[in-house]
Amino acid sequence: MADDLEQQPQGWLSSWLPTWRPTSMSQLKNVEARILQCLQNKFLARYVSLPNQNKIWTVTVSPEQKDRTPLVMVHGFGGGVGLWILNMDSLSARRTLHTFDLLGFGRSSRPTFPRDPEGAEDEFVASIETWRETMGIPTMILLGHSLGGFLATSYSIKYPERVKHLILVDPWGFPLRPTDPSEIRAPPTWVKAVASVLGRSNPLAVLRVAGPWGPGLVQRFRPDFKRKFADFFEDDTISEYIYHCNAQNPSGETAFKAMMESFGWARRPMLERIHLIRKDVPITMIYGANTWIDTSTGKKVKMQRPDSYVRDMEIEGASHHVYADQPHIFNAVVEEICNSVD
């Protein structure tokens, strides 16, 4: 990370940094515990150790439901297992649900990723497959949101025999970057803010550079998150969770930066590769009707997979975080898909 703006300072400044940046893995653990205590169904939270010494923080809900294909949920950029709290009980009513912090995010290990787009992507995918092997999951219904959707698709290209149904929720990184600016959807304020600080720094570097003002920045730029989870939390629990997830060593964030082009696009767009997924893998794409993501991608995927099952749909009243904007509708749609599998 020698050429990043986030080099660790030396000497007296390095000992002062923990006070300047009010975060720690312990604080992330504590705020996540407040979130997970809202679960009604039986759950198990633990580290899954991979052969390469990395650890993947994993939450399994309803582990006793062993008769059906499990649902595996992969969060998006800057997220973690806690953001599925509005969905986990409902979606684990009839089957086991697994979710985990992606390598480099949340409470999982934060190793150094390859600096090239393909290498970074492969590292993510390899960690998901090794996690699956270690967990002993033969097949799964694989759901990914945003960056998680991009990685779930990449995984399905490489390991199609493990995926009973691929569910992509407002997936990032599919279309090619338009050459005509008029074809680009206007991004929300927080995306513009991230884009404005890009360059040599990581996307969320501002949270770490801001020190004690970092938590306030989350609340300022993403006040919608507090509203989305208001049924569960009246305080700043979710804002705190997002801050502590992203104020740590920016390992996965650096990998994402290697994979992206101007935040909204991928250097290796998935539309150029989605045809490589085996024909018998069904795909459902779920978008928020008000998302900043290009929803025409669903129709383009259908065109590229004429002999395969591809369904795309939009949920009214939802933006990019469909699962939190309209959780009841989202849960019903995903449950219907899962029931079609078994």
Swiss-Prot record:
Family, as annotated: Belongs to the peptidase S33 family. ABHD4/ABHD5 subfamily.
Superkingdom classification of source: Eukaryota
Species assigned in the record: Mus musculus
Stretches assigned to the AB hydrolase-1 domain: 70-323
PANTHER family the record matches: (LYSO)-N-ACYLPHOSPHATIDYLETHANOLAMINE LIPASE, RE40534P-RELATED
GO-annotated biological processes: lipid catabolic process; N-acylethanolamine metabolic process; N-acylphosphatidylethanolamine metabolic process
Tissues showing expression: Highest levels in the CNS and in testis, intermediate levels in liver and kidney. Hardly detectable in heart.
Top enzyme class: hydrolase
Recorded phenotype for the gene knockout or disruption: Homozygous knockout ABHD4 mice are born at the expected Mendelian frequency, are viable and healthy, and show no overt differences in their cage behavior compared to that of wild-type littermates.
Protein name: (Lyso)-N-acylphosphatidylethanolamine lipase
Record gene name: Abhd4
Catalytic activity: N-hexadecanoyl-1,2-di-(9Z-octadecenoyl)-sn-glycero-3-phosphoethanolamine + H2O = N-hexadecanoyl-1-(9Z-octadecenoyl)-sn-glycero-3-phosphoethanolamine + (9Z)-octadecenoate + H(+); an N-acyl-1,2-diacyl-sn-glycero-3-phosphoethanolamine + H2O = N,1-diacyl-sn-glycero-3-phosphoethanolamine + a fatty acid + H(+); N-hexadecanoyl-1-(9Z-octadecenoyl)-sn-glycero-3-phosphoethanolamine + H2O = N-hexadecanoyl-sn-glycero-3-phosphoethanolamine + (9Z)-octadecenoate + H(+); N-octadecanoyl-1-(9Z-octadecenoyl)-sn-glycero-3-phosphoethanolamine + H2O = N-octadecanoyl-sn-glycero-3-phospho-ethanolamine + (9Z)-octadecenoate + H(+)
Enzyme Commission number(s) from the entry: 3.1.1.-
Keywords (A to Z) from UniProt: Hydrolase, Lipid degradation, Lipid metabolism
GO molecular function ontology, one term from the record: lysophospholipase activity
Positions in coiled-coil regions: none
